[in-house]
Amino acid sequence: MVTKRVQRMMSAAAACIPLLLGSPTLYAQTSAVQQKLAALEKSSGGRLGVALIDTADNTQVLYRGDERFPMCSTSKVMAAAAVLKQSETQKQLLNQPVEIKPADLVNYNPIAEKHVNGTMTLAELSAAALQYSDNTAMNKLIAQLGGPGGVTAFARAIGDETFRLDRTEPTLNTAIPGDPRDTTTARAGADVASLRWVMRWAKPSGAVGDVAQRQYDRAAGIRAGLPTSWTVGDKTGSGDYGTTNDIAVIWPQGRAPLVLVTYFTQPQQNAESRRDVLASAARIIAEGL
């Protein structure tokens, strides 16, 4: 059975996936923010992509917003959204049991490994993928959608012409420079409906917001660069070439929600993750508001 908390999370999100909003305009101070982001990128030795959407007036800030970046585990948001969308017309879908076999386990399975030779529901798999970044759970969602192409097809159906998922976990994390597989852009990442249903329909104190907020502490990533009084729900991702990503919905005190996407990748395959770069990018954005 699906727990009440997970059921609320899934049903609320599934009922509320909206269409993409119109093209935003740019902040007047975008140039100054972009200069600071460029300086950060230069000092980091990698390539940085940033997109901010302020939902109060649909304005945005972009830095390398239309360049492709490997998504890594941030792609789990789109996969979970696609399953939630299916559940709109298949009312019992989220309660459907999925068998977990020993051969299903891959490189990171903190939840699925506890259910080997048993089952998990699609709701539980979605929660495991989003909250714990469980890679076996992600693969089960992908299988439910007919393979990576099914996730991409969902992206096209909601108006995202940029997102593409080509492989399963863990190979989707190879992040090879110039490889278009399993990539998107910061602009598309911020504007897709898979983030907008969280931002528009989940409150920071609600079930969806709760799951996102409990994923990671404030020690790294976007959260570390923002005021501690701001509520943040995010999904991180990392892979080869020091690829370090974080996508977030942010509820600042006294402001409408913000959607912030930060992607970072490096030229060396064995480079370390750089969540500090994402924190610095978030700090630059926050100071520019």
From Swiss-Prot:
Organism in which the protein naturally occurs: Escherichia coli
Residues annotated as binding substrate: 235-237
Coiled coil segments of this chain: none
Keyword Hydrolase recorded: yes
The UniProt record lists the keyword Hydrolase: yes
Catalytic residues in the record: 73 (acyl-ester intermediate)
GO-annotated biological processes: beta-lactam antibiotic catabolic process; response to antibiotic
EC number of the protein: 3.5.2.6
Record's keyword terms, sorted: Antibiotic resistance, Hydrolase, Plasmid, Signal
A GO MF term: beta-lactamase activity
The family this protein is said to belong to: Belongs to the class-A beta-lactamase family.
PANTHER family per record: BETA-LACTAMASE (PTHR35333), BETA-LACTAMASE-TYPE TRANSPEPTIDASE FOLD CONTAINING PROTEIN (PTHR35333:SF3)
Catalysis performed (reactions): a beta-lactam + H2O = a substituted beta-amino acid
Broad EC category: hydrolase
Protein name, per record: Beta-lactamase Toho-2
Signal peptide range in chain numbering: 1-28
Function: Hydrolyzes beta-lactam antibiotics such as penicillin G, carbenicillin, cephaloridine, cefoxitin, cefotaxime, ceftazidime, and aztreonam. Has especially increased relative hydrolysis rates for cephalothin, cephaloridine, cefotaxime and ceftizoxime.
SUPFAM superfamilies for the chain: beta-lactamase/transpeptidase-like
